[in-house]
From Swiss-Prot:
Keywords: Cytoplasm, Developmental protein, Differentiation, DNA-binding, Nucleus, Spermatogenesis, Transcription, Transcription regulation
Source species of the chain: Mus musculus
Gene behind this protein: Sohlh1
PANTHER family: SPERMATOGENESIS- AND OOGENESIS-SPECIFIC BASIC HELIX-LOOP-HELIX-CONTAINING PROTEIN 1, TRANSCRIPTION FACTOR-LIKE 5 PROTEIN
Taxonomic superkingdom: Eukaryota
Cellular compartments per GO CC: cytoplasm; male germ cell nucleus; nucleus
Name this protein carries in UniProt: Spermatogenesis- and oogenesis-specific basic helix-loop-helix-containing protein 1
Gene3D superfamilies noted in UniProt: Helix-loop-helix DNA-binding domain (4.10.280.10)
Amino acid sequence: MASGGHERANEDYRVSGITGCSKTPQPETQDSLQTSSQSSALCTAPVAAANLGPSLRRNVVSERERRRRISLSCEHLRALLPQFDGRREDMASVLEMSVYFLQLAHSMDPSWEQLSVPQPPQEMWHMWQGDVLQVTLANQIADSKPDSGIAKPSAVSRVQDPPCFGMLDTDQSQATERESELLERPSSCPGHRQSALSFSEPESSSLGPGLPPWIPHSWQPATPEASDIVPGGSHQVASLAGDPESSGMLAEEANLVLASVPDARYTTGAGSDVVDGAPFLMTTNPDWWLGSVEGRGGPALARSSPVDGAEPSFIGDPELCSQELQAGPGELWGLDFGSPGLALKDEADSIFPDFFP
């Protein structure tokens, strides 16, 4: 009997499980599902309202409070200013009413403080001008005083050009004539040093005090005369102007500088080599790009020069003269005496056979 009752209970349990998992649930199950879904929807709505409620409520309350204050102010102003009766409470009308009220209050009560900026009196203005003038004169006097043997340029000397720069300006025409003469002069072989196109060591050192300001910093030689140069870039020109011989030498050296200054594209920049304090293209003659000149009595090139990295066929012929080069087309040489321009494409192919396929 006990075993039969246990089997009936198992069958009832299986029937109830099948009934609960069937596709058509009983009406009681549908009611319970609808009730649970409605309760969950009601629970999520208050949560969302609670999350957005404080910020929304605070904004609405603050906006209502602000509008209420504006309305009260407009009511008070309308009572004081009858011509604004019936106007709308927008910001323009509120500002206009406020300005009109302030003007009316100032006219009725003159003891109110005026809203205008007080102008300084004439005596105070003249006093300020005198103070500024005294400070400017004191700075000029302090600049003109010598400091440990070094003359500092004053404000007046900054306006006027130094004598050496004036001489450079006056000798511009002579420099151009000399440049044309150098262009017409026949060129010599690379074995001979060209004095017009290269600077020796004493010449570059003697040009130290008289270098014009447009010469790059890398051109200035590292000689003991560099201690006489003012830190701001100015030089002692008083002693040079007093000595006529030194001024004449300065004029000649200025002509030499103007006649032999190469193009800035080939002298300045990250790839320019420096030999003895001067740029590589400035210290060597135009045959630097033909190859090394150590075996011909010329100066040795820098180790980092572009000639070391060139092809052997490019350095090959040591007996090639610059006359043969100048017999070619005129585009090969520019006006800057040492900077080979871009030649024709066939010549470039013959010079660099590996770079141009």
